[in-house]
Amino acid sequence: MAIKFTQTSLDKIEKIIQESGYVIRYERGNFQSGYCILQAKKVVVLNKFFQIEGKINTLIDLMPQLIINFDALTHDSQKLYDEVMATAKEK
């Protein structure tokens, strides 16, 4: 199933990351990849100038790099996480 590029999809993907204890911040920056991960503080900083599609793609790309506690996720988040990870592996 393809992930739709809507605000609702973005909110759901953000929820997965937040349920794992990470803080997502949207800020200006000159990161080449469009994001920066501060593992020690569990902070993910994304380029605030990205459109919704760019934000979703960036979160999908970086999710395999994050430490996600699958058991701490809600049932809906677990299903979406599996879907996102399958999408990330296809890339």
Locate predicted features.
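Short alpha-helix carrying the canonical HExxH Zn2+-binding catalytic motif
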Residues: I52-P64
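Post-HEXXH active-site segment of zinc metalloproteases
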Residues: S33, E53, L66-K91
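Active-site scaffold of zinc-dependent metalloenzymes
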Residues: S20, R28-E53
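Short, low-complexity, polar/charged sequence segments that are solvent-exposed and flexible
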Residues: V43-L46, L62-I67
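Short amphipathic alpha-helical patches
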Residues: K15, C36-V44, D82-E90
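Auxiliary, metal-adjacent structural segments of Zn-dependent hydrolase domains
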Residues: M1-Q32
